[in-house]
């Protein structure tokens, strides 16, 4: 039977696009998979309400065999990225597929054709929908369940991409801290000493994120984020509107003691945000729907969370060479032990970011998961 590729143009097709993972991920075969919240997937795809699409566009495709969906993909034109990097890279994301090379090839071809029509010369991904959101294809660490806002896929997915001609662009790492280890403290003495020296002569303090002043706190974190990540591979600045949109979700799940800002002489210098791993709660929902019982299950499971993801750790450029990383880790160690949590993941960290990778390893963390961003060259028409 041949594969048919159709563009997603109707509400019915969109439902089939969103529902597809439940067809692919057998819960017995893939117990690590965490069903996403359907409302979150719908938001990430919504070109009318999601501010990301003010400077981006996308086209969704479904792969059908005998009329039944066997794969999906989004082709994404990210003009914000292109303007910042002065390149013609196009993107793909939200990729899911049965172990069917013909279907995968057809999906990539459809996305590439759409991007080529928009003068893109490379197709890169997966991005869901950008590096400021969920991204990367898991290539190592399949045995662990994914932390919140990270991706998981079956082990055959990398084979589908590589057989289709995709090659490595960059790897992203996750480190695991066993906070329950004896002794629980993992900060080497030299980092403690560096942290103490960094404090000397500086009016530096850490304070909890103030959820009652949420709009202004988002403004501060947005400025730090765009400054701290500016030179990272694949980064492009988030608009204030997009940052606020994404932060609205975090407002309801972060613990202010584990989302804190560093101030120097009263000015925001950096921030660290650890997100409780609600994926444990998402698993109890199963079907990805908050109603009629999902919300209750989510709130009930919240009390049992004992792990988190270090999602944001950044400082403005003028403070990066003054021991502020050691100060953040010293403060994190003190706060994390208050709650009796047992696990912490730090992700994503670029494979060549030695400024973070080396201290992670020094502190006894182990690399336990790795994602890959893939590229494939395409033949875009010359710009007119």
Q: At which residue positions do the language-model features occur?
A:
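Flexible loop/turn segments at secondary-structure boundaries
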Residues: 14, 79-82, 131-133, 182-184, ...
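A conserved beta-strand-loop-helix scaffold within acyl/acetyltransferase catalytic domains
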Residues: 21-65, 73-83, 208-209, 213-314
């Amino acid at each position: 039977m041949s594969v048919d590729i159709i563009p997603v143009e109707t509400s019915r097709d969109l439902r089939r696009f969103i529902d597809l993972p439940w067809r692919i991920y057998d819960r017995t075969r893939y117990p690590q998979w965490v069903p996403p919240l359907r409302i979150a997937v719908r938001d990430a795809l919504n070109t009318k309400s999601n501010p990301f699409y003010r400077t981006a566009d996308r086209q969704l495709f479904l792969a059908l065999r005998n009329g039944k969906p066997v794969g999906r993909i989004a082709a994404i034109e990210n003009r914000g990225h292109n303007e910042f990097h002065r390149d013609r890279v196009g993107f793909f994301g939200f990729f899911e597929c049965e172990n069917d090379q013909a279907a995968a090839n057809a999906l990539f071809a459809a996305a590439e054709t759409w991007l080529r029509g928009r003068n893109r010369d490379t197709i890169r991904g997966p991005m869901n929908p950008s590096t400021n959101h969920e991204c990367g294809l898991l290539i190592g660490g399949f045995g662990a369940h994914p932390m919140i806002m990270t991706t998981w896929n079956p082990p055959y997915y990398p084979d589908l991409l590589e057989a289709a001609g995709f090659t490595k662009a960059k790897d992203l790492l996750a480190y695991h801290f066993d906070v329950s280890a004896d002794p629980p403290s993992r900060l080497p003495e030299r980092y403690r000493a560096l942290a103490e020296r960094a404090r000397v002569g500086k009016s530096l303090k850490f304070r909890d994120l103030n959820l009652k002043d949420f709009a202004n706190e988002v403004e501060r974190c947005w400025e730090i984020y765009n400054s701290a990540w500016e030179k990272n591979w694949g980064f492009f600045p988030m608009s204030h509107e997009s940052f606020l949109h994404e932060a609205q979700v975090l407002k309801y799940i972060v613990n202010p003691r584990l989302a804190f800002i560093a101030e120097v002489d009263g000015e925001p210098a950096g921030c660290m945000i650890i997100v409780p791993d609600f994926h444990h709660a998402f698993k109890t929902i199963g079907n990805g729907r908050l109603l009629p019982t999902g919300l209750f299950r989510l709130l009930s499971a919240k009390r049992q969370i004992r792990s988190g993801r270090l999602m944001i750790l950044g400082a403005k450029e003028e403070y990066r060479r003054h021991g502020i990383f050691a100060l953040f880790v010293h403060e994190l160690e003190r706060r994390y032990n208050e709650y009796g949590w047992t696990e912490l993941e730090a992700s994503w960290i670029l494979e060549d970011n030695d400024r973070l990778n080396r201290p992670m390893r020094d502190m006894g963390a182990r690399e336990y998961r790795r994602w890959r961003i893939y590229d494939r060259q395409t033949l875009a028409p010359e710009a007119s």
